[in-house]
Amino acid sequence: MRKNMADYRIGILPGDGTGREVAIEAQRILNTIEQHTNQGFEQTVIPCGGQHYVETGHEWAEGSFDFCREEADALYLGAIGHPGAFLPNGDLAGGSVILGLRSGLDLYANLRPIKLYEGVPHKVHGKFTQIWEPGMVDMTILRENTEGLYHSLLRRSADRAMGRTPYEPPEMTFPGLQGEIAYDPRPISEHGSERLIRMGFEIAETRNGAPIDGKKRVSCIDKSNVTRGCQLFRRTFEKVSQNYPGTELDYGFIDAFTQWLTRSPESYDVVVTSNMFGDIATDLGAVLQGGMGMAASGNIGDKNAFFEPVHGSAPKYAGMNKVNPIASINSIQLMMDWLGRKNNDEQLIQIGSLIDESVADHLREGKGLTYDLGGTATCSGIGESIASRLSTKLQERF
């Protein structure tokens, strides 16, 4: 029996291009859960993004940020980016949505699971083949989400979203440099590092360890041999780690890590790193799991969170019903797990696991694959297939 009132209020921000199409598949999963459990979701759709800016002169409607901050229990975002859509200062139109939420809601942890499902090939040299082995790629990378090299842009975006005067970093001089100079400060704080790293250790407690040996391991990836910010990050890692004596510690410099990530992914369990390093490394990690169409993410703070596929809006494919919706569907899986743990709702945690199982079952057959995985299946077709499998599992479980 369904409850009369929705248990959770979910903000749906479809965004631009193919983001709108994969958002439909995310909503399909939410609707499937509602149909077969006593969980209810009040879904509020908020038009936003670059195209919305071109059409209306606004990145999203007034009051949207306040709704996301004060009323929504969780948020889903499709993708942001429309050809030629920029603000007068040159920033991406729609940045107040994705970046403004990250900074304005203090979503300090970007959660990127990197998991290879059975049946997923890798595209190398224009051919689809099996490079990495399922079961040997299963890690979570936590990227600091509010500081570092992107701090100024994040702050400006949050200021616009909250109606404040946009922040600009102070002017600086750089001895020895000539001509035009552009720069972005890279501030890293002990507070920001500590809360991210602590979350990494807490997540490691819930996992099964690294594939190669089953050991719970947290890897600190930085450039502490060069930068002061990374030296602070590593000192903070060592401080926080003292509270988790049962977890193995690992260290690496970001340049070497990119090699180890591709050659020995089975050695990694949980990775913590700074903002820009994590931005680059997680997209490289997406190659191991089959590409950006497989890469889901969560942007998580102490009170709020939003979940999104990490791929772009792919405007050239908009309206063609061909992009991969699995990153979008797995973003809902992450949402269910986060809501469940935040609200002590064990059923939601189980539902998240069933979404993961439904995706795995679909991919294991190796038939319903979109173009990015070497197939011809449609976006909606895959969404329907996974929702159907989930429906069966929910009926059997609940």
Q: Each predicted region: which residue ranges?
A:
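Glycine-rich phosphate/diphosphate-binding loop of Rossmann-like nucleotide-binding domains
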Residues: G11-Q35, M162-G252
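Glycine-rich phosphate/nucleotide-binding loop
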Residues: T258-E365
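Active-site rim loops that border cofactor/substrate pockets in soluble metabolic enzymes
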Residues: V45-Y53, R228-V271, N275, D279-I280
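Buried hydrophobic packing segments
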Residues: A26, L30, S328-M336, I386
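N-terminal beta-loop-helix "entrance" segment that forms/cooperates
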Residues: H36-G63
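Internal helix-turn-beta structural module
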Residues: R341-F398
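Buried hydrophobic positions in well-ordered alpha/beta secondary-structure cores of metabolic enzymes
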Residues: D16-G19, D73, L142, G200, ...
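N-terminal glycine-rich phosphate/adenylate-binding segment common to multiple enzyme folds
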Residues: Y53-M172, A182-Y183, M276
